Each structure stands twice: as structure tokens, then as C-alpha cells.
Amino acid sequence: MTVARRVVVHGRVQGVFFRETARRRARRAGVAGWVRNNDDGSVEAWFEGDADDVEVMLHFAETGPSGAYVERVDVEKVEPQDLRGFDVL
């Protein structure tokens, strides 16, 4: 079953290759969506795919790449948009 989650990751998450690492991991997991920096210093992402694969990406969001310090992750269940690929915006 395809699921989608919109996440906002707070903490030291910009300037630590969070977006590029998310892109690589999402593509490896077969998860579609996007990731972008927000003006407030957070990182926002959309993960869409098989429930187990999206769960892998949610776990990544909770830890981030080395150098990141994740303080909080806000997760919202959203309707899948039939996205293809994974982009850094």
C-alpha cells in the first residue's frame, strides 16, 4: 500500500548534507518525493511509497546524517500524489 508523509526536521539540519543524503537514501529505498531547506533553518520533506520504505525514511529523518543534530521531527500523514523520483528542491 502506498503511503505518504510530510516531515519537518528541526535542529542543526542545514549545512550538514541532510538533503543530499536523504535523496540518496530515498532513491535506494524506492521512495518518491522531495526535500528542501526552509527559511527557519528546518528541513522539509515529502516521502511517498511502500509503508515499510517510508518508515525507513522516517527513521533517517529522526537521526539525519553525521554532523546533524535533530531536535524534533514533525510528521503529517498526507494523501499520496503519485510522485516519481526524489528531488532536492
Task: Identify the meaning behind each predicted range.
Residues 1-89:
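Intrinsically disordered, low-complexity, mixed-charge
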